[in-house]
């Protein structure tokens, strides 16, 4: 859904390409930090893995906020805090409350999703991530009374089913293995909670871009993608740092200091990870500002599918019949939406000519 005064298809394509490139390099570093040992423990001889996810999130949020500030200054020569200082008080207060809410939902969503992996298998986790469009539309409808046209609901359903089919047919035997610990219901509740938090985050971000003052005498400062990136990450940085200092000081802060002392390379990897993630977020917030969260989520949930199609084209790999069926549903849905929008755009022109 292109917003009024939003970006062109060229802008969207450039942002999606930038998003995919950032995710690719970012995920390689994420795997390096999370799954590869940095050495052997001198006491036990066992591999030493870095296990302080909150510290990674803190550093990531700090750098993303700084990059968002630079992005604001370069793109509009303005201060992100102007949405608080240059708007009438009710609007500024609503911005502040919304930032508090989405910084908390953003901070809680991923840990809750990862926590669910203790009780449900990885396939269930992947399928939940494939369905991200549904909770966003649900929260939009229930909380903000957003009404979606039938074609958009059909497109969301087509993309979701297509990604699910693609994920199921691509998943390895290992990922389908039952790792249930008898608390599947708890794991599913955590997964659903994570999805709803994502839905609340994305739908609230969409609403923030529409927020305007009611007084005609006051000049209203609109939220931009750069402002949102800077301020949201600053809130996440403060929330996560406070939580780590109060509740996880030994297991996160002290542990990281000791680990970096023994393995300095981990800090370089974390900094690279944070900087690349921050660059990727620039594309995320451009899409949010100029289009909407549904376009963004469609781009992210189809990323793996696009990368596999590229591997087919470039390296001669093969997809099975079910995978091609999933691809057909996804691109059929996206193509149908494009056709509907083209016909809607042509209709006013035809009436004018008559």
From Swiss-Prot:
Glycosylation-annotated residues: 202
Record-annotated membrane-spanning stretches: 6-26, 54-74, 95-112, 123-143, 148-168, 227-247, 268-288, 295-317, 321-340
Extent of the signal sequence: none
Topological type in the membrane: Multi-pass membrane protein
GO cellular component: endoplasmic reticulum membrane; Golgi membrane
PANTHER family (alphabetical): SOLUTE CARRIER FAMILY 35 MEMBER B, SOLUTE CARRIER FAMILY 35 MEMBER B1
Family named by the database record: Belongs to the nucleotide-sugar transporter family. SLC35B subfamily.
Described purpose of this protein according to its UniProt entry: May be involved in specific transport of UDP-Gal from the cytosol to the Golgi lumen. Involved in the maintenance of optimal conditions for the folding of secretory pathway proteins in the endoplasmic reticulum.
Name recorded for this polypeptide: UDP-galactose transporter homolog 1
Organism of provenance: Debaryomyces hansenii (strain ATCC 36239 / CBS 767 / BCRC 21394 / JCM 1990 / NBRC 0083 / IGC 2968)
């Amino acid at each position: 859904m292109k917003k009024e005064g939003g970006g062109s298809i060229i802008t969207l394509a450039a942002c999606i390409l930038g998003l995919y490139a950032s995710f690719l390099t970012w995920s390689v570093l994420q795997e390096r930090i999370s799954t590869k040992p940095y050495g052997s423990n001198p006491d036990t001889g066992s591999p030493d893995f870095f296990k302080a996810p909150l510290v990674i999130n803190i550093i990531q949020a700090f750098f993303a906020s700084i990059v968002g500030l630079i992005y604001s200054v370069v793109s509009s020569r303005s201060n992100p805090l102007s949405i608080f200082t240059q708007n009438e008080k009710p609007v500024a207060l609503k911005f502040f409350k919304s930032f508090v809410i989405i910084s908390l939902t953003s901070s809680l969503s991923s840990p809750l999703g990862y926590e669910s992996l203790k009780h449900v298998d990885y396939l269930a986790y992947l399928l939940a991530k494939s369905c991200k469009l549904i909770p966003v539309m649900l929260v939009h409808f229930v909380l903000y009374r957003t009404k979606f046209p039938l074609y958009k609901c059909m497109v969301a359903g087509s993309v979701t089913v297509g990604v699910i089919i693609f994920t199921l047919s691509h998943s390895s035997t290992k990922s389908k293995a039952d790792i249930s610990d008898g608390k599947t219901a708890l794991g599913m509740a955590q997964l659903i909670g994570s999805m709803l938090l994502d839905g609340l985050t994305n739908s609230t971000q969409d609403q923030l871009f529409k927020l305007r003052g009611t007084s005609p005498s006051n000049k209203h400062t609109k939220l931009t993608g750069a402002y949102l990136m800077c301020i949201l990450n600053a809130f996440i940085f403060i929330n996560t740092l406070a939580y780590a200092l109060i509740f996880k000081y030994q297991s996160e802060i002290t542990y990281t200091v000791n680990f970096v002392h023994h393995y300095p390379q981990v800090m370089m990897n974390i900094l690279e990870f944070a900087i690349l993630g921050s660059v990727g977020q620039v594309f995320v917030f451009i899409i949010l500002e100029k289009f909407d969260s549904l376009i963004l989520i469609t781009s992210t949930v189809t990323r793996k599918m696009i990368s596999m199609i590229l591997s087919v084209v470039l390296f001669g790999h093969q997809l099975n019949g079910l995978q091609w069926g999933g691809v057909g549903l996804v691109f059929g849905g996206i193509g149908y939406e494009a056709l509907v929008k083209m016909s809607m755009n042509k209709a006013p022109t035809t009436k004018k000519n008559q």
